[in-house]
Amino acid sequence: MEISRASDRPFTHGEQDRFTGEVSLGSTIADPQGTNVGIVHFVAGARTRWHRHPGGQFLIGISGRGRVRSRGESGHLLLPGDVIRVGPDEWHFHGGAPDAPMAHYAVNGGGAPDWAEPVTDEEYSEGF
């Protein structure tokens, strides 16, 4: 058994080549098969770039109000307790709502994500 205590987790600032706006990341736990769990905090309007995970991703809302959208699809609201599954290699973004911050757990399957271009303001607003 492995335990990750909240008091032992340092948070780091999200890198500009992966995020737009102020984002804080907290790593929690990873297993030998490559699955990892992290906590991500977004200020209002902050978001990831377009990206995909080879092993897929689950997003579990903790607080606030967020946005999640896959390329070419309508967007979805992420609220505390909501769970969104993003399929393997599905291009998507997630972040805080324009007027509210958001925090979520991210459960990522094996393999490093592929990061692409920033989400434009138009893409961030479209489909919600």
Question: Language model features by range: what are they?
Answer:
Residues 1-35, 114-128:
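A short, N-terminal "cap"/entry segment at the start of jelly-roll beta-barrel domains
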Residues 32, 46, 68, 99-105, ...:
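Ligand-binding pocket scaffold of soluble enzyme catalytic domains
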Residues 72-89:
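Short acidic-glycine-tyrosine-enriched beta hairpin
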Residues 85, 99-118:
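A short hydrophobic beta-strand segment most commonly corresponding to one strand
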